[in-house]
Amino acid sequence: MKYPPSLVSLIRELSRLPGIGPKSAQRLAFHLFEQPREDIERLASALLEAKRDLHVCPICFNITDAEKCDVCADPSRDQRTICVVEEPGDVIALERSGEYRGLYHVLHGVLSPMNGVGPDKLHIKPLLPRVGQGMEVILATGTTVEGDATALYLQRLLEPLGAAISRIAYGVPVGGSLEYTDEVTLGRALTGRQTVSKPQPPQRPGDEDGADGAAVPASR
């Protein structure tokens, strides 16, 4: 028996979502089919509204519906500390911990040469002008192979800019994502972060070359 074309199309589109395979997409499609029409219309409206109103913050690249995100627009935040994360969901997770009052920078991914993701595919270059002498940059990428490789690449790139660089570590499970780590563990991870590079005299003239020329650690 063949599925109707409209159902096949729905399953195909749902399977494009992260973490959703063909079988999960099929279950979701049947679930949606069984829901009242008004529920489906409300879901469709919410999707269209989010796509219309949401964009990335021009400073930190977090998701926002305003000119700047709430963190960048808050003058009470610590302007001398920047926490670098992989995805917008990581910002929400760290904010829930209540242990961090600095700024953020969202990369929207990690380095993954095997998947064709190099530095030019991430929001790395816009980070460089935000970092200066006497600041601290917390590298809070995940503890996956790609997350560690991205942190090492950023460390090498940021060291000449004169900032102290630390790596989130304590309590975050190996191979884990910050988005799925509980707030207590994340709070301890921030408090127990380890310095990986002390401040050095800034070398601003090499910014452009560094962004393109620093070696990308190979992911295993």
From Swiss-Prot:
Residues 80-173 form the Toprim domain. Signal peptide: none annotated. Residues 190-220 are annotated as: Disordered. Coiled coil: none annotated. InterPro entries: DNA_Rcmb_RecR (IPR000093), Hlx-hairpin-Hlx_DNA-bd_motif (IPR003583), Rcmb_RecR (IPR023627), Rcmb_RecR_Znf (IPR015967), TOPRIM_dom (IPR006171), TOPRIM_RecR (IPR034137). GO terms for biological process: double-strand break repair; recombinational repair. Pfam families: RecR_C, RecR_HhH, RecR_ZnF, Toprim_4. It comes from the Bacteria. A zinc finger (C4-type) spans 57-72. Keywords: DNA damage, DNA recombination, DNA repair, Metal-binding, Zinc, Zinc-finger. GO terms for molecular function: DNA binding; zinc ion binding. Belongs to the RecR family. May play a role in DNA repair. It seems to be involved in an RecBC-independent recombinational process of DNA repair. It may act with RecF and RecO. PANTHER family: RECOMBINATION PROTEIN RECR (PTHR30446:SF0). This is Recombination protein RecR. It comes from Deinococcus radiodurans (strain ATCC 13939 / DSM 20539 / JCM 16871 / CCUG 27074 / LMG 4051 / NBRC 15346 / NCIMB 9279 / VKM B-1422 / R1).
